């Protein structure tokens, strides 16, 4: 295991990520600018999972042997470490297989009549035009199942939520919105959205997938009722997501999935359920992934999320400046840094996003191309696809320069220069 990182020392940080040393096609070093899709993992995370699996692997919350006890302790300590990282209490975090499942858990339970705040016919569900499909389609389905109406905040021309586009009344039962757009990079006005929702008596659901890895997040301070984030976007393993729910709400909610581990008692006629969060963690949990995610939280915490945010803002500002200086390049989202972070999505006039991505890949620069699971947002701007560069703590200014140079090459290659 490498030495711990106590400040933003890029050389030390990058040494923790072996994949960043890769030489790609054409002999070019990897410039990984796709952390908004999935991040790379430091040795500390890999080592934590490996150590658990080779020394303490066992079934959690079952039996009385030493490995079970060690596995249970590691699992619950992981929950505590992650809760500390996001400003929540330990019993307010539910582990899921990803953030999409976490959002589906909430939307499913909100359609269950056993929950006193369930959505029904005539009610209104609100989301925004800015959302990832994972925070849109579950609400479409909830509206379909319950007879509720789905409405949404629109988006301004610079990619921000248009707060004047929708009025909330007492029919609104839930307001779901992103904290940090995975396309335009905007930071949404959480306090204002929460205030409006709560004034209408609605619950709030926050998609925090793009904020938790990149800036300080305190869920209690934000005042949301529910939030979801994923492990693989914050230097952690695949196969692990987190649902945050206020304690009093989780205590009232019926389960989403049923089976082993989440019960209190079972007879042939029925069952009673364990308290939250165990009530929502049916079956064998993803123990090693929790251990790895906790290691990722500790790793980022040791660097300091304020330092992470400041570093990434410098990279985003440099990318916006560099791309804005290229004729024919249009940035989707704000071109100022006010309430803005990573990613930077863009189009090159006359060149398809996939072709831009291929030219960049030929130079070792990895970006995402497509609609980034935000098709309605792209349609709002009349676009089928964009190229998207997204940054993480391990990226460098040199990699931004390579991005800009690669976009210039794409224009020359396709005769647009």
Swiss-Prot record:
Active site: 373 (cysteine persulfide intermediate)
Gene3D superfamilies: Aspartate Aminotransferase, domain 1, Type I PLP-dependent aspartate aminotransferase-like (Major domain)
Natural source organism: Mycobacterium tuberculosis (strain ATCC 25618 / H37Rv)
EC category: transferase
GO terms for MF: cysteine desulfurase activity; pyridoxal phosphate binding
UniProt keywords, alphabetically: Acetylation, Pyridoxal phosphate, Transferase
Positions where N6-(pyridoxal phosphate)lysine occurs in the chain: 233
Coiled-coil segments on the chain, per record: none
Protein name as catalogued: Probable cysteine desulfurase
Enzymatic reactions: (sulfur carrier)-H + L-cysteine = (sulfur carrier)-SH + L-alanine
Other noteworthy facts: Was identified as a high-confidence drug target.
SUPFAM superfamilies the UniProt entry points to: PLP-dependent transferases
Cofactor (UniProt): pyridoxal 5'-phosphate
UniProt similarity note: Belongs to the class-V pyridoxal-phosphate-dependent aminotransferase family. Csd subfamily.
Superkingdom: Bacteria
CC annotations in GO: plasma membrane
Job description of the protein: Catalyzes the removal of elemental sulfur and selenium atoms from L-cysteine, L-cystine, L-selenocysteine, and L-selenocystine to produce L-alanine.
EC id: 2.8.1.7
NCBIfam families: sufS
One GO BP annotation of this record: cysteine metabolic process
InterPro entries (UniProt xref): Aminotrans_V_dom, Aminotrans_V_PyrdxlP_BS, Cys_dSase_SufS, PyrdxlP-dep_Trfase, PyrdxlP-dep_Trfase_major, PyrdxlP-dep_Trfase_small
PTM sites of type N-acetylthreonine: 2
């Amino acid at each position: 295991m490498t030495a711990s990182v106590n400040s933003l020392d890029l050389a030390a940080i990058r040494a923790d990520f072996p994949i960043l040393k890769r030489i790609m096609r054409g002999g070019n070093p990897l410039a990984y600018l796709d952390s908004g899709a999935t991040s790379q993992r430091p040795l500390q995370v890999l080592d934590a999972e490996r150590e658990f699996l080779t020394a303490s692997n066992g079934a959690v919350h079952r039996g009385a042997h030493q490995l079970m006890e060690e596995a249970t302790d590691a699992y619950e300590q992981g929950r505590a470490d992650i809760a500390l990282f996001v400003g929540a209490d330990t019993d307010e975090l539910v582990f899921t297989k990803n953030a999409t499942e976490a959002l589906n858990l909430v939307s499913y339970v909100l359609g269950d009549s056993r929950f006193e705040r369930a959505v029904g016919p005539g009610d209104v569900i609100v989301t925004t035009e800015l959302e990832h499909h994972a925070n849109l389609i579950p609400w479409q389905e909830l509206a379909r199942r319950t007879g509720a109406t789905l409405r949404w905040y629109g988006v301004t021309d610079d990619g921000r939520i248009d707060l004047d586009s929708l009025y909330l009344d007492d029919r609104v039962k839930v307001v779901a919105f992103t904290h940090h757009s995975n396309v335009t990079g905007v930071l949404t006005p959480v306090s204002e959205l929460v205030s409006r929702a709560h004034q209408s008596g609605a619950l709030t659901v926050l998609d925090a997938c793009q904020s938790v890895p990149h800036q300080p997040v305190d869920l209690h301070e934000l005042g949301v009722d529910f939030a979801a984030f994923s492990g693989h976007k914050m230097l952690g393993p695949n196969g692990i997501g987190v649902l945050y729910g206020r304690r009093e709400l989780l205590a009232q909610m019926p389960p989403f999935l049923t089976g082993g581990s989440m019960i209190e008692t079972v007879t042939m006629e029925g069952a009673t359920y364990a308290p939250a969060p165990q009530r929502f963690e049916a079956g064998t949990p993803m123990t090693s992934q929790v251990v790895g995610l906790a290691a990722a939280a500790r790793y980022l915490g040791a660097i300091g999320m304020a330092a992470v945010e400041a570093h990434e803002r410098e990279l985003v500002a440099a990318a916006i400046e560099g791309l804005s200086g290229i004729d024919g390049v249009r940035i989707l989202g704000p071109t100022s840094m006010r309430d803005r972070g990573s990613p930077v999505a863009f189009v090159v006039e006359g060149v398809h996003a996939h072709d831009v991505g291929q030219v960049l890949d030929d130079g070792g620069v990895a970006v995402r191309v497509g609609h980034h699971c935000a098709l309605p947002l792209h349609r709002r701007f009349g676009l089928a696809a964009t190229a998207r560069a997204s940054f993480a703590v391990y990226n460098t200014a040199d990699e931004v320069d390579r991005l800009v140079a690669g976009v210039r090459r794409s224009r020359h290659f396709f005769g647009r220069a």
